[in-house]
């Protein structure tokens, strides 16, 4: 229980647009925020964790019309699914806001009127392009191949009377805010915002619409509704009671300590939102973290591609904690991550079942077998103990810093270094050999105590990531609530010397990887292949900047072998013109190892490393679906130098 001795901490997800049911992409942001919120509570902060739904806009109005229901009826059903998912995933939000809530609607009307009265909002005519799915206005010059630069979809002509927000008046101030503070993270996003949106000339923002009705009415000008972004962004303060009497803790929690959002809406949170707050003379939030996208098998998740992952399926099959672990584990700081069924199963099998689960079960089982569950007071230390004890005792500090910086993948990496070292320590000390001699029992007790203490520290730091599983670990290793408090996690030796363990259920059952991947493939919709008669222009379009993020290189396969545990996978050693790398590829059904050695291939060089069937994979080779269940690798000419950039 938090004693709230450290002050306040206010963290927010974006509020999600309920035009369709939630998917794994929504889970990342919410799980990440929940992890940080839980960690800050452990540290003693009074945490306010806000999430919710952004329910207005033309897209919702059109979707409801298609279904023959009112917009409110349409969003009510989907919002219920969001809340059900957050309950399934163990999300500990403190407040859930809906932009259709009466208190929020009235507060937005007051905010809009205040900005108008101050002269920051003026009436004019809007002529340009509009993307309905993104709820975004664009000029002709901002389009990419005539499409929305954010989502690649078609835009429509828009011409209507509208109110505008004078963003242009604040261009210099918001640029200074972005460049002279650490508000926007990672720092690479600052250059994107300044160079792409501010320096070319920050244009005033259209903040009302007359062509649809589903929105917050502009109460002093009937026919206008407040444009969705002013409505949505204001949730961060209205949910605390700003300009309403629903809540009264605005002065307590504002400014926000961390806004977290996906990169496609960073510009609204880094430019529009600070400007609105400046206009209202309100303090600016402290930090904004714009994370990358979750791609499925290398493609951005999209309902039109049929590759949206249902998190309910994953949570039901593997438990919510396994999903909570895998998503942040494979999301590099600020970059996109690649999700695949193989990666998901690999993490559960290798990290959770083999490494963590096996460490706990082996240690508890040995304590139970050799000492009846209770360790003796007498112990004998040896120098070989020092490295594990030192690593475990020093773990909390770097992990805390990384979580504070939203670098969750690196935080987990640090924790699992100690888990790995503890497993190695078992092999080094061989408790089963020590148990054969009565005179070695004090030494055996010391070994098992060191393992239990290492598990205590690791599980304490893992609790924010896996809040349902770690209490089960504590019960098995004999740790009560006081022994897993944050302040104890930097100290080695907190468990009583005569600690009693309790054998329990298997935390993460072992998985038949090949069988499980096949079953998961049948449960989760695979990516849709574009047929010859389909319009390629209507496929999921990306911008040139997005494409530039994918680094394609040439390489030569110098060695290749099958992986015993997986019939579909080959382990490739690739000369990439630098230090070489290992890539695991699911092409064993179509190629023999000897067919590939010496061949030149194209591979993705900046894909986050992942373990597949226990083997490190540092990239992805390019191959083509040739139809009729046939896959062909893309080979290059022999004279292409290894490591060449593919353009």
For the regions a protein language model found, what residue spans apply to each?
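A glycine-rich helix N-cap at a beta->alpha junction
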Residues: 80-92
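Cys/His-rich short segments
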Residues: 118-171, 175
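Phosphate-backbone binding interfaces of nucleic-acid-interacting proteins
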Residues: 528-647
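Structured secondary-structure scaffolds
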Residues: 2-51, 103-107, 157-369, 411-415
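Short secondary-structure capping/junction motifs at helix and strand boundaries
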Residues: 89-98, 116-129, 141-142, 156-158, ...
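Intrinsic disorder at enzyme termini
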Residues: 473-546
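Helix-rich, typically C-terminal accessory recognition domains appended to large enzymatic cores
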Residues: 123, 330, 335-338, 343-381, ...
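N-terminal catalytic cores of NTP/NDP-binding nucleotidyl/phosphoryl-transfer enzymes
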Residues: 2-78, 97-112, 117, 134, ...
């Amino acid at each position: 229980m938090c004693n709230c001795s450290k002050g306040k901490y206010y963290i927010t997800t974006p509020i999600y647009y309920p035009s369709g049911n939630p998917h794994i992409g929504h889970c990342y942001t919410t799980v990440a925020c929940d992890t940080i919120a839980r960690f800050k509570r452990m540290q003693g902060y009074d945490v306010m964790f806000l999430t919710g739904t952004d329910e207005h806009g033309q897209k919702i109005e059109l979707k409801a019309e298609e279904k023959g229901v009112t917009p409110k009826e349409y969003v009510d059903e989907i919002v219920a699914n969001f809340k059900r998912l957050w309950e399934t995933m163990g999300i500990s939000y403190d407040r859930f806001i809906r932009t259709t809530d009466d208190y929020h609607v009235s507060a937005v009307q007051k905010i809009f009127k205040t900005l108008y009265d101050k002269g920051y909002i003026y009436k004019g005519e809007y002529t340009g392009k509009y993307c309905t799915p993104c709820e975004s206005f664009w000029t002709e010059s901002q389009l990419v191949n005539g499409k929305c630069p954010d989502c690649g979809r078609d835009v429509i002509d828009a011409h209507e009377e509208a109110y505008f927000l004078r963003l242009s008046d604040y261009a210099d101030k918001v640029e200074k805010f972005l460049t002279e503070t650490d508000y926007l993270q990672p720092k690479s996003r600052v250059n994107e915002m300044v160079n792409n949106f501010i320096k070319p000339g920050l244009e005033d923002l259209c903040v009302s619409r007359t062509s649809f009705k589903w929105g917050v009415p502009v109460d002093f000008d009937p026919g206008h509704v407040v444009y969705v972004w002013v409505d949505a962004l204001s949730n961060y303060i209205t949910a605390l009671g700003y300009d309403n009497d629903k809540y009264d803790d605005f002065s307590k929690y504002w400014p926000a300590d961390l806004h977290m959002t996906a990169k496609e809406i960073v510009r609204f949170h880094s430019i529009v939102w600070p400007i609105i707050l400046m206009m209202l003379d309100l303090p600016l939030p402290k930090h904004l973290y714009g994370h990358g996208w979750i791609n499925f098998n290398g493609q951005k998740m999209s309902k039109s591609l049929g590759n949206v992952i249902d998190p309910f399926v994953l949570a039901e099959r593997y438990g919510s904690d396994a999903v909570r672990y895998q998503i942040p584990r494979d999301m590099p700081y600020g970059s996109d991550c690649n999700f695949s069924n193989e990666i998901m199963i690999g993490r559960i099998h290798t990290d959770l079942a083999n490494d963590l689960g096996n460490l706990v079960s082996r240690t508890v089982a040995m304590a139970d077998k050799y000492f009846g569950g209770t360790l003796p007071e007498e112990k004998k230390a040896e120098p070989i103990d020092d490295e594990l004890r030192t690593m475990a005792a020093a773990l909390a500090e770097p992990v805390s810093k990384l979580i504070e910086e939203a670098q969750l993948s690196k935080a987990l990496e640090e924790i699992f270094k100690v888990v790995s070292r503890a497993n190695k320590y078992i092999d080094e000390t061989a408790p089963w050999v020590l148990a054969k001699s009565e005179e070695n029992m004090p030494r055996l007790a010391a070994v098992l105590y060191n393992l239990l203490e290492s598990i205590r520290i690791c599980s304490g730091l893992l609790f924010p990531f896996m809040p349902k599983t770690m209490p089960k670990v504590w019960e098995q290793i004999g740790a009560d609530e006081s022994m897993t408090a944050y302040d104890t996690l930097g100290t080695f030796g907190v468990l009583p010397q005569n600690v009693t363990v309790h054998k329990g259920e298997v935390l993460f059952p072992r998985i038949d990887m090949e069988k499980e991947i096949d079953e998961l493939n049948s449960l989760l919709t695979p990516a849709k292949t574009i047929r010859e008669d389909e319009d390629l222009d209507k496929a999921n379009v990306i911008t040139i900047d997005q494409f530039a993020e994918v680094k394609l290189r040439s390489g030569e396969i110098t060695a290749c072998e099958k992986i015993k545990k997986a019939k579909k996978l080959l382990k490739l050693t690739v000369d990439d013109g630098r230090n070489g790398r290992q890539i695991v590829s699911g092409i064993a059904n179509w190629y023999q190892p000897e067919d590939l050695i010496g061949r030149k291939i194209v591979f993705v060089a900046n894909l986050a490393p992942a373990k597949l069937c226990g083997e490190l994979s540092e990239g992805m080779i390019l191959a083509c679906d040739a139809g009729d269940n046939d896959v062909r690798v893309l080979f290059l000419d022999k004279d292409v130098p290894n490591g060449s950039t593919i353009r």
